[in-house]
A protein has these predicted regions:
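Basic amphipathic alpha-helical segments that dock to polyanions
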Residues: 90-95
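Short, Lys/Arg-enriched N-terminal segments with co-localized hydrophobic residues
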Residues: 21-46
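A short alpha-helical element within helix-turn-helix/winged-helix DNA-binding domains
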Residues: 71-80
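Key DNA-contact positions within bacterial/archaeal DNA-binding proteins
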Residues: 85
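Beta-hairpin "wing" of winged helix-turn-helix
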Residues: 99-106, 111
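Non-DNA-binding regulatory cores of transcription-related proteins
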Residues: 113-185
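Short amphipathic alpha-helical interface segments
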Residues: 55-67
Length: 185
């Protein structure tokens, strides 16, 4: 929602069943709100959700073990130690985005639709996570929707953070991850 800075107030919009309501709200803490600040019950932060991490692992497993043949998700689940039920929730999303294709029956399963070097971690994370911008006022197309933008001292920080994150994950492909023979898939 907003970057909260101690001692300030912000104009917030509450959205509910009765519509929108503008309120002035005190902001007592400093914390960034966005995709990388998802608090777990244990109090630890999380940058990428399980959906994002598992989507990468599924595609990486198919890249390493499939080639042209179809791989049953049961095998991927066993190798990756991921619940088959959870994988079955992710594969339709991967299929509808054109990342994988499937075949039914004997010899069926899933396989990649492109070569491993054609999949970047950024596009996989975008598919699995949705909007990857670190704050709600910044959008993936670079536009900003915040009345404070003209005088916001923190906006350039979030813009640079988003750019660095996008460039970093865009520079890593599934093929790159396959190159480390020391680590098991």
């Amino acid at each position: 929602m907003y970057l909260a800075l101690g001692g300030y107030t912000a104009l917030c919009q509450l959205v509910g069943g009765s519509g929108r309501k503008d309120i002035s709200c005190p902001i007592p803490l400093i914390y960034p709100v966005g995709w990388w600040y998802n608090k777990k019950k244990t109090g630890e932060g999380s940058m990428i959700s399980t959906k994002g991490r598992y989507s990468i692992r599924i595609l990486l497993d198919l890249a390493a073990n499939g080639g042209e043949k179809y791989i049953p998700m049961k095998e991927v689940a066993a190798r990756q130690e991921i619940s088959l039920k959870y994988i079955e929730k992710l594969t339709p999303v991967l299929k509808s985005a054109g990342f994988v294709e499937s075949a039914h029956g004997i010899g069926g399963g899933y396989r990649l639709t492109r070569k491993p070097e054609a999949y970047t971690l950024w596009e996989i994370l975008q598919l699995a996570e949705g909007d990857l911008t670190p704050v709600s006022c910044l959008h993936e197309d670079g536009s900003v929707t915040c009345c404070r933008a003209p005088h916001c001292r923190t906006l350039p920080v979030w813009q640079r953070f988003y750019t660095m994150t996008r460039e970093y994950f865009s520079g890593i492909t599934l093929a790159d991850l396959l190159q480390d023979p020391e680590k098991p898939l």
